[in-house]
């Protein structure tokens, strides 16, 4: 018996030791892979930067430690990483050109315009750009059209079709469950509530949406026309004929592409451009490789570039559905901006905003911190795809506002939308409520028991009215405009940045680089460098987050899986997490 117990204990100790040793070896292997991934990248002569244009592009690249196991790097591309890599490729004499691998790129046009402009600047160095793809989405083609040569697979597709905007309406769907919506708002154009209360677009919403997509399409056609030498009328004709269903040969005749080739043939053509022998290899650098290519000397003063992207909420704990990267949490942002304000090494701040708005209270808090920051050092706002409603609220106090021509901004308005569940709970489910109270409004807002009464709705409307007046006043102060002038361009209306420039909601059309240059000018800096904030999460935090349901990696997987249903899914799922009063973009549309 003693021998049996000894053998069992020895076996258990041995197994325990084995797992410890294997755990240590595994951890060392992971650390080794991460360390090797972060090692400085050597650039060989006759190198080519291979830029993959597929998937989604976020504002900031997020580290995905799972990529070393999954091999999937396309989901974590950051605009900041892409722009930085293009700059490095331009400056490095050993990198001879950029090879664009086009594909199913799902990103809005202001972001694509940033990339396209950077590629156009790259070409000014005398280096070449070649694009190739089996399938070009319209956005991918818009970017790729700046290349010296655009090639396509002999059976490939260019999905050139124009821009359409669709809104989903849930009124009848929710009514089947006995759910209605209590809505109060200020602003004729503040139509975010329509998706819950109407069956189609209002005339005001249709007007502003049509204006937005028409302006964006004009900008796209003008850029492609200039690069490809195709008239705008022809581009519209091609869109009407829906090129995706036309024969590939049609694309060559239409001058949309320069030729039809297979992938290996394009690579041979690139070798000829580089004057390499057929047997010579091309040294290819991916986006991840480029991130580890040494930058130029870091000299001069620091300009901080702070990224704020996603729905506006008050607390990071509110951002529990997916990753915190999809939210602007006011408490964290205010703390970060205060730290930058008090950092004597930071001479100016560029706040990069990409948001359709959100919580009105949170927007007010960030407005205050932006105002305090401006008192100490220049603060320039760079607007991404969206900087509307609550996002414009927080932008208003900036020293200078820069937006891409295709940026959607404005939407100065407030609304509250609250689900009335009383029909579901009492009628459908048969639940009954009774109450006692000390004061008239002690049970205010219990919409599971009953709808708002007239007095309650009037009080909520008064609160929204006060929020709108304050929003309007903040814009007037920040933009140095009379309140009356702000009212004429407010009412919840969204504006394309080209129009926003004319009505003084923005100061300049351009991208992040233009915003940085303006910040340097305002701070009177000759030599400067930029640093990105917030700092990237540690690899351990990133790994744990990637494996959780709140990870950015899984969020992107869900985005690709759900496709067109991702946006309504996230909106409906987040309703119960919202504060009642919102300063949010006036509609949730799917733009294609």
Task: List where the protein language model places each region.
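Active-site proximal loops enriched in glycine and acidic residues that flank catalytic Cys/His/Asp
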Residues: 307-310, 353-355, 383-385, 405-407, ...
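Short glycine/threonine-rich loop-to-helix capping motif typified by GTGT followed
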Residues: 360-365, 499-502, 542-547
């Amino acid at each position: 018996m003693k021998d049996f117990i000894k053998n069992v204990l020895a076996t258990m100790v041995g197994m325990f030791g084995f797992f410890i040793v294997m755990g240590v070896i595994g951890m060392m292997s992971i650390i080794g892979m991460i360390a090797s991934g972060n090692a400085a990248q050597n650039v060989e002569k006759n190198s080519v930067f291979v830029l993959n244009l597929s998937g989604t592009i976020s504002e900031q690249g997020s580290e995905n430690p799972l990529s070393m196991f999954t091999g999937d790097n396309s989901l974590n591309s950051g605009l900041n990483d892409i722009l930085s890599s293009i700059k490095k490729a331009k400056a490095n004499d050993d990198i001879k050109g950029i090879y664009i691998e086009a594909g199913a790129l799902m990103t809005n046009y202001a972001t694509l315009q940033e990339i396209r402009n950077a590629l156009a600047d790259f070409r000014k160095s005398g280096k070449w750009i070649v694009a190739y793809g089996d399938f070009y989405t319209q956005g991918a083609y818009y970017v790729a059209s700046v290349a010296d040569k655009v090639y396509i697979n002999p059976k490939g597709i260019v999905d050139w079709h124009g821009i359409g905007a669709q809104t989903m309406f849930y009124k009848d769907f929710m009514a089947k469950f006995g759910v209605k919506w209590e809505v109060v708002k200020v602003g004729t154009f503040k139509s975010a509530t329509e998706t819950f209360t109407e069956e189609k677009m209002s005339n005001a919403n249709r007007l502003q949406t049509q204006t937005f997509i028409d302006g964006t399409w004009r900008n796209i056609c003008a850029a492609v026309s200039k690069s490809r030498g195709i008239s705008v009328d022809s581009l519209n004709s091609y869109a009407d004929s829906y090129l995706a269903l036309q024969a590939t040969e049609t694309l060559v005749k239409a001058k949309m592409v320069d030729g039809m080739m297979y992938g290996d043939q394009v690579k041979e053509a690139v070798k000829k451009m580089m004057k390499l022998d057929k047997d010579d290899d091309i040294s290819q650098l991916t986006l991840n490789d480029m991130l580890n290519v040494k930058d130029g000397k870091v000299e001069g003063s620091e300009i901080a570039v702070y990224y704020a992207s996603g729905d506006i909420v008050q607390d990071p704990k509110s951002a529990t559905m997916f990753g915190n990267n999809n939210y602007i949490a006011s408490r964290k942002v205010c703390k970060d901006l205060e730290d930058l304000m008090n950092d004597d090494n930071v001479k100016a701040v560029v706040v990069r905003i990409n948001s359709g708005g959100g919580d009105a209270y949170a927007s007010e808090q960030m407005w205050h911190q932006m105002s305090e920051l401006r008192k100490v050092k220049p603060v320039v706002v760079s607007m991404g795809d969206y900087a509307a409603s609550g996002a414009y609220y927080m932008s208003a106090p900036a020293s200078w506002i820069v937006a891409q021509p295709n940026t959607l901004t404005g939407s100065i308005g407030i609304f509250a939308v609250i689900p009335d569940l009383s029909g579901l709970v009492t009628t459908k489910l048969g639940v009954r409520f009774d109450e006692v109270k000390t004061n008239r409004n002690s049970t205010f807002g219990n919409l599971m028991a009953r709808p708002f009464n007239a007095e309650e709705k009037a009080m909520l409307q008064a609160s929204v009215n006060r929020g709108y007046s304050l929003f309007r006043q903040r814009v007037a102060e920040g933009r140095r405009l009379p309140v009356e002038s702000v009212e004429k361009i407010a009412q919840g209306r969204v504006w394309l940045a080209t129009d926003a420039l004319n009505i003084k909601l923005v100061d300049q059309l351009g991208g992040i680089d233009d915003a940085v240059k303006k910040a340097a000018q305002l701070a009177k800096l000759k030599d400067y460098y930029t640093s990105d904030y917030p700092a990237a999460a540690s690899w351990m935090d990133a790994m744990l987050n990637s494996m959780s349901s709140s990870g950015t990696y899984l969020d992107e997987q869900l985005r690709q899986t759900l496709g067109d249903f991702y946006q309504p899914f996230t909106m409906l799922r987040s309703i119960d997490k919202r504060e009642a009063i919102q300063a949010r973009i006036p509609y949730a549309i799917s733009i294609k």
